[in-house]
Amino acid sequence: MASSMISSPAVTTVNRAGAGTVAPFTGLKSMAGFPTRKTNNDIASIASNGGRVQCMQVWPTTGKKKFETLSYLPDLDDAQLAKEVEYLLRKGWIPCLEFELEHGFVYREHHRSPGYYDGRYWTMWKLPMFGCTDASQVLKELQEAKTAYPNAFIRIIGFDNVRQVQCISFIAYKPPSF
């Protein structure tokens, strides 16, 4: 019996993945670990008269001018203003005061589409209060601005210098005629 060994050259190619390639899609994971129904034990979501809800009446939509963020609420007193300023300081935002002598409300003189950018330009009161940690400092500046411009609208804004955006803005003082 003769045995013979035949050797043949085998060529293999290696396909190395490049640094920028992504593994192929292998399919969706099982949904067994996720709940299919979310239960809510909040009393506000129960459809019954079991809980009493207190709602604040908002101002009428006609005949009232729209100001900034909290314009649908009654004017804020000093304690409420202090709480708003403390909130923006807790968030790490930089407080700044701005005033407007003519139009503290929304109007469409230079731009016809709705939104924040509607042609209103406010003047900054001093510089932004970088490093401010106390709401009383902001309220002191507000009193100075009210004394200097008693017929102006004055608002407090909170600026996030990391994201470079204005995060909060509300009217802190309206002229006596409004």
From Swiss-Prot:
<dbReference type="InterPro" id="IPR000894">
    <property type="entry name" value="RuBisCO_ssu_dom"/>
</dbReference>
<keyword id="KW-0113">Calvin cycle</keyword>
<dbReference type="GO" id="GO:0019253">
    <property type="term" value="P:reductive pentose-phosphate cycle"/>
</dbReference>
<dbReference type="Pfam" id="PF00101">
    <property type="entry name" value="RuBisCO_small"/>
</dbReference>
<dbReference type="InterPro" id="IPR024680">
    <property type="entry name" value="RuBisCO_ssu_N"/>
</dbReference>
<keyword id="KW-0602">Photosynthesis</keyword>
<keyword id="KW-0934">Plastid</keyword>
<dbReference type="InterPro" id="IPR036385">
    <property type="entry name" value="RuBisCO_ssu_sf"/>
</dbReference>
<keyword id="KW-0601">Photorespiration</keyword>
<keyword id="KW-0120">Carbon dioxide fixation</keyword>
<dbReference type="Pfam" id="PF12338">
    <property type="entry name" value="RbcS"/>
</dbReference>
<dbReference type="GO" id="GO:0016984">
    <property type="term" value="F:ribulose-bisphosphate carboxylase activity"/>
</dbReference>
<dbReference type="GO" id="GO:0009853">
    <property type="term" value="P:photorespiration"/>
</dbReference>
<keyword id="KW-0809">Transit peptide</keyword>
<comment type="similarity">
    <text>Belongs to the RuBisCO small chain family.</text>
</comment>
<dbReference type="GO" id="GO:0009507">
    <property type="term" value="C:chloroplast"/>
</dbReference>
<comment type="subunit">
    <text>Heterohexadecamer of 8 large and 8 small subunits.</text>
</comment>
<keyword id="KW-0150">Chloroplast</keyword>
<protein>
    <recommendedName>
        <fullName>Ribulose bisphosphate carboxylase small subunit, chloroplastic</fullName>
    </recommendedName>
</protein>
<feature type="transit peptide" description="Chloroplast">
    <location>
        <begin position="1"/>
        <end position="54"/>
    </location>
</feature>
<comment type="function">
    <text>RuBisCO catalyzes two reactions: the carboxylation of D-ribulose 1,5-bisphosphate, the primary event in carbon dioxide fixation, as well as the oxidative fragmentation of the pentose substrate. Both reactions occur simultaneously and in competition at the same active site. Although the small subunit is not catalytic it is essential for maximal activity.</text>
</comment>
<dbReference type="InterPro" id="IPR024681">
    <property type="entry name" value="RuBisCO_ssu"/>
</dbReference>
